[in-house]
C-alpha cells in the first residue's frame, strides 16, 4: 500500500495492535474508560489539531464530536483533572512499545528512499525542554538562578534518527545527566550496534575513552574534533591533499593516536580526516573508526547530522514538544513517545507525498483528516 493518504497511514496502526499491547503491558488494569488506546488516539489527535497543548485542550478535544468520530469512543465526557491524573499514573511502557513498533514498521515504508550511504546513518543528539521549578521536585539546573521568581529546570531527551525516522528515545530528568558525556553515551550504547550502521554525533561527546569503547564494541562512528585537537600522526591512510568536494578542500587522511586530557597519548588508532572550508578557510577535523569509506564520504556523512537539528525544530515548533503538559516524569515520557510516533506518521506522509516542509505536511495531513471525517460522517442523501 502506498502511504500517500491519511487513511492508509492510520490503517497501519490497527486497533488490534493497540489492544494487544494494552493487554501485554497491563496499561488498562482497573480502568474502564480512559484506556491506553483511547489516550494514545487523543494525544495524536490533539497534537495534529493544536499548536499549544494543555490538559484543558485535551479535555476540549476529548469531549468534541470530532474526536468521538475519530476514536469511536461514543459520548463519554471527562475532565482535564482526570486526564492529567491518568497521564501521571498509566504505564509509559505501553507508549514505549508502540514507539518501538512504529519505528520498525514504518521504516519499511521508506526503505527505498535515498542512497545506501544515507540509509546507514543513525544520528544521535539531545535537546532540552524547560519547566518551572515551582511545579516539580526534579529537573536539571542550568546556568544562574533568576533574581526574581522561580527558576526553570530542564528535561533532556536524546533521540536517535535513523534514515528519516526516529529510532530511539531516552529521557533524562536528573542533574547527573546534564553532561552529554554521560547522556549521549548511554543513549548510543542502549540502542545497540547495527550491521553497517554509521553512528553520528557532535562535539558534546568527545571523551577519548568513550570513542575507544565504541570501537571495541564494534560500533562504527563519525564525529567531529575540536579546533584544538591534539594527536600523534602514525601513518597516512590515503593521499587526498589538494582534492575538493562539497565546498571542502581536503588536507589529510591519516591514522592517529589521540591525546587524553591534553597531555597523555592513548595508544588506540583512530582515523582523522582534515579539511578546510573553501569559502572561509575554517579547518574541520573528522574523527572515525571507519576505514573503508573515502574521506569525502566521511565528511559527507557527518553533514547528515544536520537532519536531527531540523527534526528537533519540527517537533518543538509543530508538535509543541517544548511545552510539557504533565508535571510527572511518567506523563512527560508519554508525551514524548507519542510526539515521536506522530512525527513518524507525518514524515511518512511528507516523503511519500513529496512535500518539502514539515509545516506544510502537517497542515495537509490535518486537512485530509478533516475531509475524511466529513466524507465518512456526512448525512446520507434522501432517496
What would you call each of these model-derived segments?
Residues 79, 123-124:
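Noncatalytic, basic helical substrate-engagement surface that gates or grips nucleic-acid strands
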Residues 1-56, 61, 88-90, 94-102, ...:
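Single, function-defining residue in the core of a domain
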Residues 70-92:
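Major-groove recognition helix of helix-turn-helix-like DNA-binding domains
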Residues 64-69:
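A broadly used, surface-exposed interaction patch
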Residues 104-111:
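A short, well-structured juxtamembrane/interface segment
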Amino acid at each position: 500500500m502506498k502511504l500517500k493518504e491519511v487513511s492508509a497511514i492510520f490503517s497501519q496502526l490497527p486497533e488490534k495492535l493497540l489492544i494487544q499491547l494494552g493487554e501485554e503491558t497491563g496499561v488498562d488494569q482497573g480502568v474502564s474508560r480512559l484506556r491506553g488506546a483511547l489516550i494514545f488516539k487523543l494525544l495524536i489527535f490533539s497534537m495534529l489539531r493544536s499548536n499549544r497543548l494543555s490538559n484543558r485542550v485535551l479535555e476540549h478535544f476529548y469531549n468534541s464530536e470530532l474526536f468521538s468520530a475519530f476514536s469511536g469512543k461514543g459520548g463519554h465526557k471527562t475532565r482535564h483533572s482526570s486526564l492529567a491524573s491518568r497521564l501521571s499514573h498509566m504505564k509509559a511502557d505501553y507508549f514505549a512499545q508502540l514507539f518501538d513498533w512504529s519505528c520498525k514498521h514504518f521504516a519499511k515504508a521508506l526503505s527505498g528512499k535515498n542512497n545506501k550511504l544515507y540509509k546507514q546513518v543513525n544520528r544521535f543528539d539531545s535537546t532540552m525542554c524547560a519547566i518551572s521549578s515551582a511545579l516539580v521536585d526534579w529537573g536539571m539546573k542550568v546556568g544562574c538562578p533568576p533574581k526574581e521568581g522561580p527558576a526553570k529546570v530542564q528535561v533532556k531527551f536524546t533521540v536517535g534518527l535513523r534514515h528519516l525516522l526516529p529510532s530511539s528515545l531516552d529521557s533524562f530528568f536528573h542533574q547527573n545527566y546534564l553532561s552529554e558525556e554521560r547522556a549521549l553515551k548511554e543513549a548510543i550504547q542502549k540502542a545497540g550496534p547495527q550491521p553497517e550502521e554509521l553512528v553520528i554525533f557532535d562535539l558534546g561527546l568527545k571523551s577519548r575513552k568513550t570513542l575507544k569503547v565504541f570501537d571495541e564494541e564494534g560500533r562504527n562512528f563519525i564525529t567531529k574534533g575540536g579546533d584544538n585537537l591534539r594527536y600523534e600522526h602514525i601513518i597516512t591512510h590515503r593521499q587526498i591533499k589538494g582534492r575538493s568536494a562539497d565546498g571542502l578542500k581536503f588536507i589529510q587522511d591519516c591514522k592517529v593516536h589521540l591525546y587524553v586530557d591534553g597531555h597523555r597519548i592513548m595508544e588506540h588508532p583512530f582515523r582523522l580526516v582534515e579539511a578546510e572550508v573553501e569559502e572561509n578557510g575554517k579547518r574541520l577535523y573528522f574523527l572515525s573508526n571507519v576505514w573503508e569509506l573515502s574521506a569525502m564520504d566521511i565528511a559527507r556523512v557527518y553533514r547528515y547530522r544536520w537532519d536531527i537539528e531540523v527534526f528537533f525544530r519540527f517537533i518543538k515548533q509543530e508538535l509543541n514538544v517544548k511545552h510539557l503538559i504533565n508535571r510527572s516524569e511518567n506523563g512527560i515520557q508519554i508525551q514524548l513517545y507519542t510526539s515521536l510516533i506522530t512525527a513518524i506518521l507525518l514524515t511518512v506522509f511528507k516523503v511519500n507525498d513529496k512535500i518539502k516542509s514539515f509545516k506544510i505536511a502537517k497542515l495537509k495531513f490535518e486537512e485530509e483528516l478533516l475531509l475524511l471525517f466529513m466524507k465518512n460522517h456526512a448525512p446520507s442523501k434522501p432517496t
